[in-house]
């Protein structure tokens, strides 16, 4: 059985939360809870409030996501 494709959207980090979690506001105005992807954690990429990021959302739960890219 094939896995569903993740939905990729852009957003802005609102606030950092404990355990490398972040509150992110998406372009459409929704707020989601997102964690850092493994590669970003491995390369010590820091994310601060106000950063523009790319978030992958699961089609099953649109309130949680994974931050995959921090834009310059």
From Swiss-Prot:
This is Translation initiation factor IF-1. Component of the 30S ribosomal translation pre-initiation complex which assembles on the 30S ribosome in the order IF-2 and IF-3, IF-1 and N-formylmethionyl-tRNA(fMet); mRNA recruitment can occur at any time during PIC assembly. InterPro entries: NA-bd_OB-fold, RNA-binding_domain_S1_IF1, S1_domain, TIF_IF1. Residues 2-72 form the S1-like domain. One of the essential components for the initiation of protein synthesis. Stabilizes the binding of IF-2 and IF-3 on the 30S subunit to which N-formylmethionyl-tRNA(fMet) subsequently binds. Helps modulate mRNA selection, yielding the 30S pre-initiation complex (PIC). Upon addition of the 50S ribosomal subunit IF-1, IF-2 and IF-3 are released leaving the mature 70S translation initiation complex. HAMAP family: IF_1. NCBIfam families: infA (TIGR00008). It comes from Leptospira interrogans serogroup Icterohaemorrhagiae serovar Lai (strain 56601).
């Amino acid at each position: 059985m094939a896995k569903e494709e993740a939905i990729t959207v852009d957003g802005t980090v609102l606030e950092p939360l404990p355990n490398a979690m972040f509150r992110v506001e998406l372009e459409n105005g929704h707020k989601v809870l997102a964690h850092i992807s493994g590669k970003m954690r491995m390369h010590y990429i820091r994310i601060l409030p106000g950063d523009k990021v790319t978030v992958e959302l699961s089609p099953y739960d649109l309130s949680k996501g994974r931050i995959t890219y921090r834009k310059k």
